[in-house]
Design a protein with these regions (language model features):
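ABC family nucleotide-binding domain
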Residues: 4-5, 10-181
Length: 181
């Protein structure tokens, strides 16, 4: 079996002054390469928290998360960051585009960090596929919400990652662009 991701009894709790808030409770999940999975639930049900855990941006209270058969819950932040940089693309609900970088620069940065050839050209080709050819040199503040979302998606998939985590990936897109993505 080509297991890409495995969660075993993953729990996430937050402690406030008065309460313990259980966000995720004994989550078990196994995915294979090329699987497409949707996690659906009410607002506040833990979907974003699950993405943050899988992406190594937050630590589980307990349980294990394996990515490509490696227990990422036992790794240092730097080691998890390296895995994320090379193998995981994340589309956040808030796009987190770099405000003083153009659309091309926001996408090319991922490619540059991974020392790929022609990052600017690759970024332009990807953005062109997403209908943003006339927006290459625009800053995020000069883009609509839907355009920013397409830049964020292009950035997440630029490295052709093994795993793409997307939090409401088409939330700001019209129906035509949702289908295109």
């Amino acid at each position: 079996m080509d297991t890409l991701l495995k969660l075993k009894k993953v729990n996430l709790k937050y402690q406030t002054d008065k309460d313990t808030i259980k966000v995720l409770n004994n989550i078990d999940l196994t995915t294979k390469k090329k699987d497409t999975i949707s996690i659906m639930g009410e607002s506040g049900s833990g979907k974003t928290s699950l993405i943050m855990l899988i992406g190594g941006l937050e630590k589980a209270t307990s349980g294990k998360i394996f990515f490509r058969d490696q227990d990422i819950t036992s790794l240092s932040e730097d080691e998890v960051s390296e895995i994320r940089r090379k193998h995981i693309g994340i589309v956040f609900q808030s796009f987190y585009l770099i405000p003083n970088y153009t659309a091309v620069e926001n996408v090319a940065l991922t490619l540059e960090l991974n020392k790929l050839k022609n990052p600017q050209q690759q970024a332009k080709e990807l953005l062109d596929r997403f209908g943003l050819k006339n927006r290459f040199n625009n800053l995020p503040s000069q883009l609509s919400g839907g355009e920013q979302q397409r830049v964020a998606i292009a950035r997440a998939i630029a490295m052709k990652p093994d795993l793409i985590l997307a939090d409401e990936p088409t939330g700001n897109l019209d129906s035509k662009n949702s289908v295109m993505i």
